[in-house]
């Protein structure tokens, strides 16, 4: 089932068009990694799909950005005097009552989301998970903050998750763990997940399809092996990136 459908989409800013005439669709149940040189428009496209900035032309259909999308940006801002629990709980606010009170179900989803990203089991006796939830968000490293923001996106339980370089601050084991988690959510829960990344090796190994973007040639969307065999990565990055 097609969930995101872009037709002749142009993205950018009032003074500059970054990409134009993009037509592609993303399906439910797949994880797509978006690759491309710096400045080609990956983050701009994500922000447009999330509804944070208007398209300059064309259409985006198949979902409602404000209701159906969770977005994780690459910048990790400090939120002073706020616990990890409270940051993740922000993902549940659209579902709370007028008073903003969290239900027992909300609390369970918060715990499960953090446990998934942390690679822990969500049990009542898990004291390390409880300590992490109660800790100060601003006191953590950028990598830990990034995992908390991913947990917040999971807690929103939206059909579409958009992530801008979600593994940028993580070490290799946690990069793999996060991408494995996102792929499992796509395959098992039918989510549409689009990730902007520079992790070419992991994207080739773990994504269902790759959206390859270049300033000159627009986009190509295909399985990783198809793009590699066609020499698309070499052309996009201007060098033989598969030499040893």
Segments from the language model and where they lie:
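H-loop/switch region of ABC-family ATPase nucleotide-binding domains
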Residues: 197-198
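H-loop (His-switch) and adjacent beta-strand-loop-beta switch element
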Residues: 210-223
């Amino acid at each position: 089932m097609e969930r995101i459908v872009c037709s002749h989409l142009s993205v950018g800013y009032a003074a500059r068009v970054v990409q134009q005439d993009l037509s592609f669709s993303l399906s439910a149940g797949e994880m797509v990694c978006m690759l491309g040189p710096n400045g080609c428009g990956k983050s701009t496209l994500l922000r447009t799909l999330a509804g944070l900035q208007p398209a300059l032309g064309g259409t985006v259909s198949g979902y409602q950005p404000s209701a159906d999308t969770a977005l994780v940006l690459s910048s990790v801002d400090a939120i002073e005097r706020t616990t990890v629990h409270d940051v993740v709980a922000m993902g549940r606010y659209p579902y709370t009552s007028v008073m903003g009170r969290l239900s027992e179900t909300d609390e369970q989803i918060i715990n499960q989301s953090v446990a998934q990203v942390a690679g822990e089991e969500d049990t009542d006796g898990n004291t390390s998970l409880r300590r992490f939830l109660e800790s100060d968000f601003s006191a953590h490293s950028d990598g830990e903050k990034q995992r908390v923001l991913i947990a917040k996106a999971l807690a929103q339980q939206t059909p579409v998750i958009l992530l801008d370089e979600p593994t940028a601050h993580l070490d290799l084991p946690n990069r793999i763990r996060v991408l494995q988690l996102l792929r499992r959510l796509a395959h098992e829960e039918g989510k549409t997940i689009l990730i902007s990344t520079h992790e070419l090796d992991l994207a080739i190994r773990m994504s269902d399809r790759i959206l390859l973007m270049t300033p000159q040639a627009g986009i190509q969307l295909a399985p990783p092996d198809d793009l590699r065999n066609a020499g698309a990565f070499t052309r996009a990055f201007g060098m033989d990136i598969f030499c040893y």
